[in-house]
Amino acid sequence: MLTGLSQYSFIAVFLLRVVVATIFIVHSLPKLRNSEKMAKGLGMPSGAVLALGIVEFASAVGIVLGIFLRLAALLLAAVMVGAIATKIGRWKVSFTAPDKTGWEFDLLLLAASLVIFFSASGIIGF
């Protein structure tokens, strides 16, 4: 009955790209605007927070525009691996922490980034 919809799967991947890019752009802006304050909250050097914000923003733009799409998706997946590792290893946060932000959303963004990496090619593929 719905088998004919598979011809439109590119629309679903594009919608995923837009949503993932929007999330990463929104989360990159505080790192770009106030890296010193974010660094204190994250326990990272301010230069690393600024670099993280640049990677998140540039990769998100690449994902939504389809420029170096696979590279951008891979970079965002790496960011999420780092976020998950930090939450589990350094901060000892559980998957769904009632008093903190757990890492379930990070895992979802990691999976979405990998779906984009494996299923899509953009204007300038890499």
Residue spans of the language-model regions?
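Extended, low-polarity transmembrane helix blocks
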Residues: 1-40, 46-54, 58, 65-126
